[in-house]
């Protein structure tokens, strides 16, 4: 029986160093590819128990071409489609028309106090570094959350790194679309949202009116109590990023690893043959 406790030969050591260098070189394109990422968007209802709920949140990563509404202006059809009923079909369609390369989606279902939901979107951070959102607040006739400045949230910097890990919305930032007359009997979540009466006003901040729904039974079965102050945190949007390697880089890395493995096996076989011959 032949045994050996000799240290690795110099060629083996050279091979190990070469393999490491190759891995670094082949892996560099993967690490450097920061433009395309998978973004997990998580939404959380921070409102007190028995308080406000939220319709599914409409979201989009974009380049700045879509502006759904403005403070002090008459609500547009896209934002009304969110504020009155929460469906947001016109919002999504207008977003797609204004910014065709944007990445859009809808997060969660009805979000009750304390609940959360998430969605994963693949985002080109160089093309779509900005984030826009809109979602109905219930109970209400036409209240919603969202950003009126499309450039307000630049969540990715020039290198593709995440620059805003989360967005927190306070009660004082809840919007009134001014498109539907206040009427508990026609309010979503506590009444018949189909009984709408146009108001013809303008978009404004308004959370205080939510207290007028106190004591009413919600669609979820609890007795509503707003319990909000202007500084109360009511909603959070969080972002978590996972890099997406380029397909070409993955192919190169796989081929390189296979090649290095084959070379290592040949070197070991040659070394074994030499040792046997010498013995």
Question: Model segments located where?
Answer:
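N-terminal secretory signal peptides that target proteins for export/translocation
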Residues: 1-13, 275-279
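Bacterial N-terminal signal peptides
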Residues: 17-27
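Sec/Tat signal peptide C-region and signal peptidase I cleavage site
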Residues: 28-35
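Structured domain cores in non-transmembrane regions
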Residues: 36-38, 46-162
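A long-range scaffold signal marking pre-active-site subdomains of enzyme folds
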Residues: 36-62, 217, 221, 227-242
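Extracellular low-complexity, O-glycosylation-prone Ser/Thr/Pro/Gly-rich "stalks"
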Residues: 164-241
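A short, hydrophobic C-terminal helix/tail in secreted or cell-surface proteins
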Residues: 246-265
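C-terminal membrane-anchoring or membrane-association module
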Residues: 262-279
């Amino acid at each position: 029986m032949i045994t050996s406790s000799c240290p690795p030969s110099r060629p083996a050591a050279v091979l190990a160093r070469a393999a490491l260098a190759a891995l670094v070189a082949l892996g560099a394109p993967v690490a450097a590819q920061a433009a395309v990422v998978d973004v997990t968007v998580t939404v959380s209802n921070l409102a007190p128990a028995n308080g406000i709920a939220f319709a599914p949140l409409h979201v989009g990563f974009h380049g700045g071409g879509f502006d759904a509404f403005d403070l002090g202006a008459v609500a547009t059809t896209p934002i009304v489609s969110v504020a009155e009923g929460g469906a947001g079909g016109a919002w999504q369609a207008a977003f797609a028309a204004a910014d065709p390369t944007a990445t859009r989606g809808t997060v969660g279902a009805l979000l009750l106090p304390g609940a959360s939901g998430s969605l994963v979107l693949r985002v080109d951070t160089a093309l779509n570094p900005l984030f826009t959102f809109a979602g109905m607040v219930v109970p209400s006739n036409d209240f919603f959350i969202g950003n009126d400045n499309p450039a307000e949230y630049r969540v990715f910097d020039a290198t593709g790194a995440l620059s805003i890990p989360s967005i927190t919305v306070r009660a004082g930032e809840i919007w009134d679309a001014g498109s539907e007359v206040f009427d508990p009997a026609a309010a979503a979540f506590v009444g018949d949202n189909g009984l709408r009466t146009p108001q013809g006003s303008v978009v404004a901040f308004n959370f205080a009116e939510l207290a007028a729904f106190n004591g009413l039974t919600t669609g979820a079965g609890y007795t509503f109590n707003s319990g909000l102050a202007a500084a109360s945190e009511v909603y959070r949007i969080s972002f978590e990023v996972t890099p997406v390697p380029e397909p070409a880089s993955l192919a190169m890395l796989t081929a390189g690893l296979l090649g290095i493995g084959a070379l290592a096996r040949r070197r070991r076989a040659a070394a074994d043959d030499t040792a046997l011959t010498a013995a």
